């Protein structure tokens, strides 16, 4: 059972990503002047170099194969124990002066981990140009996460650039993060999702034109090719989003409103990689593997609860993540997916919990465990080279279920390659408990 307990209503109302990172709704509440080119001036396009070929207005550039990638994945051998994959992901991925983006880039570098950063497109759009954004079923320029200041856009660009160069994935969290009312993303059609995706991509691909800044380097990737998956705001609207994602050739989606710790399958031809229910220490129910869902079960509707609670809550959050990892690693080896936000909720205890959990996992790896901290894209690369019948066999293992007779006998058939298809498999439930859709 997935329980949000008393926090369910709070989670649904605040919708996880928190408006504090932006300027607040559609107004101009952000600190500092937001820019954009003046007088219609078009910024100068960077010239090609030996290492970079500008794309479009030079906001992005082709710089070759992404560095710091794992070796090419191979199929499991007959009887081989699957690796334990762990994916840490971040919704929004804006750097707003709290230093959290570079903090976790440093942590990942220290422990040879790769992550996925689901960038909100409007985080690269100056507020002065907000009317370029035409969100489905919402007023032009509206955004429930606001807009960043000029300085914060520049900081975000700097960290997104660094992230890609260090081997991390840049996905999308789309744009305005609408979770309630008639304009909610949960009501969008496939065509409206396509519009939202096209706009999110344009804000990444045209930040130079929209800002007027000519003194910053290009983002070192082709976003049309880089973008192969995302996570929807509040985990809403996945069914229609999948139609758009499939038509765009996306390889995965991380928007499911709640899953279990089992091996994934495809929906509509797209890998469905959900947040998962994990043990919640001291409670009789489980919680989704995302910082905000843990918060909702601790401080209900407050992101700034009394500090006296913080030490115990930090430990509970840390142990929830470690317990989720251990349950998978010691049993069915299902991939472990963790979602987060660059937020200082309740004194930053959830950021500390993520760091503590990642360090715990890294120590297990250092002891010799076959643990791989990867991005969603890298994990999808591995899935796509496995033989369909091997993945189908893995899906027969339920939550916390060890293979009968050990891995050698369980996967003793032939290995190989091939497309995995849209098989669900035993135990691959969705776990759509109360309030499950509220934490992203």
List each language-model region with its residue ranges.
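N-terminal export signals
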Residues: 1-19
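Active-site-adjacent pocket scaffolds in enzyme catalytic domains
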Residues: 44-48, 52-55, 59, 134-139, ...
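Well-ordered, non-membrane alpha-helical segments in soluble/globular domains
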Residues: 100-102, 149-157, 193-198, 314-323, ...
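Long, low-complexity, intrinsically disordered segments
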Residues: 422-440
């Amino acid at each position: 059972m997935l329980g949000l307990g008393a926090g369910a209503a709070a989670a649904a109302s605040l919708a996880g990503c928190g408006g504090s990172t932006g300027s607040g709704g559609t107004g101009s509440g952000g600190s500092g002047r937001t820019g954009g080119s003046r007088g219609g001036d078009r910024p100068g396009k960077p010239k090609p170099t030996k290492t970079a070929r500008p794309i479009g207005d030079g906001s992005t550039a082709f710089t070759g194969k992404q560095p710091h990638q794992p070796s090419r994945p191979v199929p499991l051998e007959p009887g081989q124990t699957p690796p334990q994959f762990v994916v840490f992901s971040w919704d929004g991925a804006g750097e707003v002066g709290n230093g959290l983006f570079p903090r976790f880039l440093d942590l990942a570098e220290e422990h040879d981990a790769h992550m996925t950063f689901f960038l909100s497109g409007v985080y690269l759009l100056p507020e002065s140009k907000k009317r370029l954004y035409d969100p489905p079923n919402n007023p032009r320029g509206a955004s429930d996460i606001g807009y960043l200041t000029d300085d914060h856009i520049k900081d975000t660009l700097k960290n997104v650039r660094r992230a890609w160069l260090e081997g991390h994935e840049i996905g999308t969290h789309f744009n305005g993060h609408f979770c309630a009312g008639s304009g909610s993303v949960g009501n969008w059609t496939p065509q409206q999702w396509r519009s939202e995706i096209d706009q999110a991509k344009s804000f990444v691909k045209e930040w130079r034109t929209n800002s007027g800044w000519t003194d910053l380097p290009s983002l070192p990737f082709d976003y049309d090719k880089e973008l192969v998956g995302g996570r929807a705001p509040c985990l809403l609207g996945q069914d229609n989003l999948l139609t758009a994602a499939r038509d765009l050739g996306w390889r995965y989606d991380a928007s499911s409103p709640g899953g279990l710790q089992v091996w994934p399958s495809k929906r509509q031809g797209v890998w469905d990689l959900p947040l998962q229910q994990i043990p919640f220490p001291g409670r009789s129910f489980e919680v989704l593997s995302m910082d905000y869902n843990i918060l909702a079960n601790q401080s209900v509707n407050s992101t700034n609860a009394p500090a006296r609670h913080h030490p115990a809550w930090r430990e509970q959050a840390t142990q929830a993540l470690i317990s989720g990892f251990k349950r998978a690693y010691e049993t069915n080896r299902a991939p472990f997916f963790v979602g987060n936000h660059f937020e200082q909720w309740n004194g930053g205890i959830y950021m500390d919990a993520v760091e503590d959990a990642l360090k715990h996992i890294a120590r297990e790896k250092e002891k010799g465990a076959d643990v791989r901290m990867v991005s969603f894209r890298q994990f999808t690369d591995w899935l796509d080279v496995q033989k369909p019948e091997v993945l189908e066999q893995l899906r027969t293992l339920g939550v916390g279920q060890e293979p009968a007779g050990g891995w050698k006998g369980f996967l003793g058939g032939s290995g190989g390659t091939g497309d995995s298809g849209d098989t669900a498999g035993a135990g691959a439930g969705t776990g759509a408990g109360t309030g499950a859709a509220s934490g992203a």
